């Protein structure tokens, strides 16, 4: 089989609270290079690992992993709303493979996804329906959280399934890197916000707009240095990406959730989507691939350590 790997950060603040034009241009150049590689590769199926931010998954029932048999974008932060082109039989077969191999995934015939999944679709392939996409939710924001090891095993099982398809498969990881946006935790939230975290599906346009405005205000304060949010940790980000480049699965398995939160911020756990994508690539190619860092910069305006990585089996020597 032929396989391609792409991992990229996302931020809802893109286009709302931007860094300097030079930084925006550098990010766009990195994305354009990855977009061209995707188009040239022409994937027959995409496996997209991504988190959610209390737009589709809530604490009434919060799975650690979920395979979307059908999925729709909620259209938050000016992302495109509407159905995603999910190859239903492949998605269902993938879920069956995972469950039969001791990965206890949930499935959804009505998955709702937000910018965490939609931004890479828009930026790398121009929209929701350009290619068949199997959406793979990885819980990255709602404790209790899986370990990096479990994310790796999940991704590896997806990669083993993809290998059997004998198709051109693209593995995308969306999320991270270090960041701690203003998302209340259930234990400290007000009663009203706790109810939202539990059952906040399909909010009114006014309520969604108010929530998004709070995030914009927080980004402005964070960029100005007037914020109590956890700082971006470039040292952590670069060490994490180096472990991925080196395929140092032992080092990655040794990461502890408490240390990730303390060193890099609670939402850094989104980076487990990158681990899953790399593990899928590793399994699909039997380790015969190489990955490289394409871009990294701490971007406070976007409240994130923003990174991009890519890899292909053809690069391996």
Swiss-Prot record:
> Protein name, please?
2,3-dihydroxyphenylpropionate/2,3-dihydroxicinnamic acid 1,2-dioxygenase 2
**Where do the catalytic residues lie?**
115 (proton donor), 179 (proton acceptor)
Instruction: Describe the subunit structure.
Output: Homotetramer.
Q: What class of enzyme is it?
A: oxidoreductase
One Pfam family it belongs to = LigB
InterPro entries xrefs: DHPP/DHXA_dioxygenase, Xdiol_dOase_suB
Under catalytic activity, the entry for this protein gives: 3-(2,3-dihydroxyphenyl)propanoate + O2 = (2Z,4E)-2-hydroxy-6-oxonona-2,4-dienedioate + H(+); (2E)-3-(2,3-dihydroxyphenyl)prop-2-enoate + O2 = (2Z,4E,7E)-2-hydroxy-6-oxonona-2,4,7-trienedioate + H(+)
Pathway per its UniProt entry is: Aromatic compound metabolism; 3-phenylpropanoate degradation
Q: Which Gene3D superfamilies match?
A: LigB-like
The answer to whether the entry has keyword Oxidoreductase is yes
Biological process per Gene Ontology, one example term: 3-phenylpropionate catabolic process
Alphabetically sorted, this entry's keywords are: Aromatic hydrocarbons catabolism, Dioxygenase, Iron, Oxidoreductase
Family, as annotated = Belongs to the LigB/MhpB extradiol dioxygenase family.
Q: Its encoding gene is what? A: mhpB2
Q: Which cofactor does it need?
A: Fe(2+)
Question: What's this chain's function?
Answer: Catalyzes the non-heme iron(II)-dependent oxidative cleavage of 2,3-dihydroxyphenylpropionic acid and 2,3-dihydroxicinnamic acid into 2-hydroxy-6-ketononadienedioate and 2-hydroxy-6-ketononatrienedioate, respectively.
Q: Which GO terms describe its molecular function?
A: 3-carboxyethylcatechol 2,3-dioxygenase activity; ferrous iron binding
Q: Per the UniProt record, which EC number(s) apply here?
A: 1.13.11.16
